[in-house]
């Protein structure tokens, strides 16, 4: 099956590792699906792929390498959001597209902006220049593993962005919440594509990142995860 074979498009193994360890094909006897979970708009499949390695490190007596890989199968919005083309004068995260219908007799490359779908709840008030709430605000849920002493500040950091959204005519556009308890919502899961999260990682890594899932047709951000490593604050202190 698809989940029991290697896909070069995912680059599970870097080329120099393949060369150094003489990594071959997938060993299907040692590869398997670990779990599969379905949600209203996505399915998450976790599987293990094992590869043969004729020149594995000495400590590796199995002569194999195993990797856990997660695939997300996501339903895209039926109502496509209008595209916004990149303006190179402004910094954006973008999706590169290729136009094969160009009259220049060659393919043309262009970029579309990755952005949230923020639509005014009161269009007439919005046109008058009044601040209005969006139909669907951006909501981030805190990772349950976030230390209690930091939660207040994580929320403040997320909601500080409201001042920026107000310049675009929206109030209360971005909200940070604690995750619901099992009693409040037994089906809540950070793997559910309907929920964006702020994930705390107990790691010595001095970094943070914000990967997102976007509709490749339009650039609409469907879900986002802010990943905050424990030692990121230490990195900030160095630059003060």
Predicted segments — roles?
Residues 157-158, 192:
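Short secondary-structure boundary/capping segments
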Residues 1-146, 164, 168, 173, ...:
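Auxiliary tRNA-acceptor-end handling modules of aminoacyl-tRNA synthetases
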Residues 144, 148-156:
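Soluble non-cytosolic domains of exported or imported proteins
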């Amino acid at each position: 099956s698809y989940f029991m074979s290697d896909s070069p498009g995912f680059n599970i193994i870097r080329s120099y590792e393949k060369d150094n360890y003489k990594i071959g094909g997938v060993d299907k006897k040692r590869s398997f699906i670990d779990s599969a979970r379905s949600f209203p708009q996505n399915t998450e499949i976790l599987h293990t792929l094992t590869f043969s390695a004729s020149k594995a490190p000495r400590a590796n007596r199995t002569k194999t390498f195993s990797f856990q890989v997660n695939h997300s199968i996501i339903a895209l919005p039926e109502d496509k959001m209008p595209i916004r083309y990149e303006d190179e004068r402004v910094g954006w995260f973008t999706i590169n597209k290729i136009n094969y219908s160009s009259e220049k007799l060659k393919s043309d490359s262009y970029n579309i902006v990755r952005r949230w779908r923020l639509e005014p709840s009161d269009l007439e008030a919005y046109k008058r220049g009044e601040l209005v709430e969006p139909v669907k605000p951006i909501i981030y849920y805190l990772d349950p593993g976030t230390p209690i002493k930091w939660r207040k500040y994580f929320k403040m950091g997320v909601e500080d962005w409201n001042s920026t959204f107000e310049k675009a005519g929206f109030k209360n556009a971005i909200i940070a919440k604690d995750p619901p308890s099992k009693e409040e919502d037994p089906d809540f899961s950070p793997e559910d594509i309907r929920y964006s999260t702020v994930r705390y990682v107990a790691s010595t890594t001095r970094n943070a990142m914000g990967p997102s899932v976007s509709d490749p047709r339009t650039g609409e951000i469907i879900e986002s995860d802010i990943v905050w490593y424990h030692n990121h604050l230490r990195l900030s202190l160095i630059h003060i």
